[in-house]
């Protein structure tokens, strides 16, 4: 046999296999609901608890008090109103977390740009979404919004945020880290973490490490980041990425899914844009954009969840405000 033809026969199956792999389509985002039962909103609290998705409060506009309703769903499509007027009032950009088998909501903003506006440092908990207990009227950390709170190594950690939403300045931004065993009593872990003061950022826990990334400030001095920081103890932080490939942004969402950190959506002022992208990383250093054929429209201050082995996206500002729900399911061996 001619050696040239023999070589082509051996190589052809390899090229053909690689080509098939490259053409394998990515799973699309699926629209679960065009209009959920709750009023379109952004900046709401979100949780997964006792086999349900939960939406708490949020923002309709800057000239009314924020909503105090609580909604739950077992499938993302059909929603039940659990409470119309929860006792907490600071429900714009609150921090929410499930801890000690309870739903917790803390911090947040009240009354938009109206007189009597304020930030909070109260902590509330509930086991059913209807009955809420005031765990702490005034935690040791200063009243603030748009911080992050995570469970990490058996304790709650609260990081960053801003003390004054529409009327603050750079001094209102925080880069402190607080820790609590029970959500009531908090201790200062570090007054100035290595990352710059910021709000509207996100945090994640993966492989025994805690990450802080993105965020910045909205007004009056806008700035946004796309850096990534990591810690193994909540106190000592190191920068692993100065500028991730996703554009710097605030008001985005994040989850951990399939052992990757995900960054989704958000807003930037330069360019002035709501982002509709999704990026994932296993280490905060190397990022890949997820680009299926069908995805959700760009938005900011939406909710994201990991529920029933899928990522869910709900609500947010396009504009207009929306109350749609989307989901993405990736194979377990993806």
Tell where the protein language model's regions lie, with residue ranges.
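N-terminal secretory signal peptides that target proteins for export/translocation
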Residues: 1-2
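Sec/Tat signal peptide C-region and signal peptidase I cleavage site
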Residues: 18-22
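Kelch-like beta-propeller repeat domains
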Residues: 23-334
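Sec-dependent N-terminal signal peptides
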Residues: 5-14
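Intrinsically disordered, low-complexity Ser/Thr- and Pro-rich stretches
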Residues: 13-16, 231
